[in-house]
Amino acid sequence: MEKLKSIKITLVKSLIGAKKRHRLIIQGMGLRKINRTVFLPDLPSTRGMINKTAYLLKVEE
C-alpha cells in the first residue's frame, strides 16, 4: 500500500476578522492558535481547504 504524502500547514494570521466559514475550515484542519502546525495528507479535500484559506496559512510540502 502506498504511503500518502503529507503537507505541513501553519496558521500565520489571526482568525479574528476572517469569515466564519473560513474559521470553521481552519478548525476542521485542527489549527487553533497562531504559529501552530499540523501535518495533513495530500488529498484533494485538503488542497481545497488550503485554497479557501490560503491567506491565513503557510504551506510546505
Curated annotation (Swiss-Prot):
SUPFAM superfamilies linked to this entry: Ribosomal protein L30p/L7e (SSF55129)
Keyword Ribosomal protein: yes
Keywords: Ribonucleoprotein, Ribosomal protein
Domain of life: Bacteria
GO MF term set: structural constituent of ribosome
Gene Ontology biological-process entries: translation
Pfam families for the chain: Ribosomal_L30 (PF00327)
A single cellular component GO annotation: cytosolic large ribosomal subunit
Assembly, per entry: Part of the 50S ribosomal subunit.
Family label: Belongs to the universal ribosomal protein uL30 family.
Name of the protein: Large ribosomal subunit protein uL30
Record gene name: rpmD
